[in-house]
C-alpha cells in the first residue's frame, strides 16, 4: 500500500549507510464535513420608562413637604414654591 515503509536500498550493508531517497506520493483523500447546527441568540429589546411626577398650579405647602420627604429637593429648578400658600406654576418635577 501507499503507507508501507520504504524498501531497503540494496543488500544489507555492514554499516547503516544508504543514499537512495525514499519519497512516496499518495492519492488525495476526500472528507465530507457536515456543518453542525449553530444557535444564535439575539438579545431581546430593552424596555425602559421614565416616569415623571407633575404638579401644576399647586397652592398647598403640603406638596413641598411630601416631595422633600421623598428625597426630591424643592430647589432643583423643576418645582418652585413662592412662600406658604403662594401659587406655583411648574411644568415638571425631576424623578
From Swiss-Prot:
Domain of life: Eukaryota
One annotated Gene Ontology cellular component of this protein: intermediate filament
Heme as UniProt keyword: no
UniProt-recorded Gene Ontology molecular function terms: structural constituent of cytoskeleton
Keyword Ion transport attributed: no
N-acetylserine: residues carrying this PTM: 1
InterPro entries in alphabetical order: Keratin
Coiled coil: none
Protein keywords: Acetylation, Keratin
Sequence similarity: Belongs to the avian keratin family.
Quaternary context: The avian keratins (F-ker, S-ker, C-ker and B-ker) are a complex mixture of very similar polypeptides.
The protein's name in its UniProt record: Feather keratin B-4
Amino acid at each position: 500500500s501507499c503507507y508501507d515503509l520504504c524498501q531497503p536500498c540494496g543488500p544489507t550493508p555492514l554499516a547503516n549507510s544508504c543514499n537512495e531517497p525514499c519519497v512516496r506520493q499518495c492519492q488525495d483523500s476526500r472528507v465530507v464535513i457536515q456543518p453542525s447546527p449553530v444557535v444564535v441568540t439575539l438579545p431581546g429589546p430593552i424596555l425602559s420608562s421614565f416616569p415623571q411626577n407633575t404638579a401644576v398650579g399647586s397652592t398647598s405647602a403640603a406638596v413641598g413637604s411630601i416631595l422633600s420627604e421623598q428625597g426630591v429637593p424643592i430647589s432643583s429648578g423643576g418645582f418652585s414654591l413662592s412662600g406658604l400658600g403662594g401659587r406655583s406654576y411648574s411644568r415638571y418635577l425631576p424623578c
